[in-house]
Amino acid sequence: HMAGFDATAVGGFGKEHFQNFDVGAMQGFKADHLGNFTSDAIGGIGMDHMKAFDPSAMAGFGKDQFGAMAASMMGAFDTEKIMNFDPTAMGGFDMEKMAAFDPNAVGGFGKDHMAAFDPSAMGGFNMEHMAAFDPNAMGGFDKSHMAGFDATAVGGFSMDHMKAFDPSAVGGFGKDHMAAFDPA
């Protein structure tokens, strides 16, 4: 189901949409902040869409490289599919478990595409914006909470990169930017 996935792009999205991400903040959400995270709120993808998810295509990690991570933190992944999760490592994966991973990129993000991300924030959202965090909403943010949305704090993306932001779309990106994404 990953036929339209562009390995050289950021998470399948064109490089032009991800100019200001910082490699130093790769993990984004700290483990202790994920307590209220629900699998049905991951990037707006419902569980019914996760059935077609191919763990072997996840950011270049092979399915045999997944294992001890809590299923509640990974949504569609069972504990048996996430063997070597290391919360202290980059993105939760130990470097020696990243054989199928592109050494010149971090989670699919090229090092040269990562600059203005706020490492002290959660997934790009400053703590004051997290007060409105709703684990049952798309990506954790309900439309009614988007009033406090700070485009410059989201993954460090500048306003220019946030033009196409659509809170009702998958992962916040408009359908016209989801061309390479196949949820089914």
Describe the residue ranges of each PLM region.
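General marker for long, soluble alpha-helical cores
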Residues: 1-184
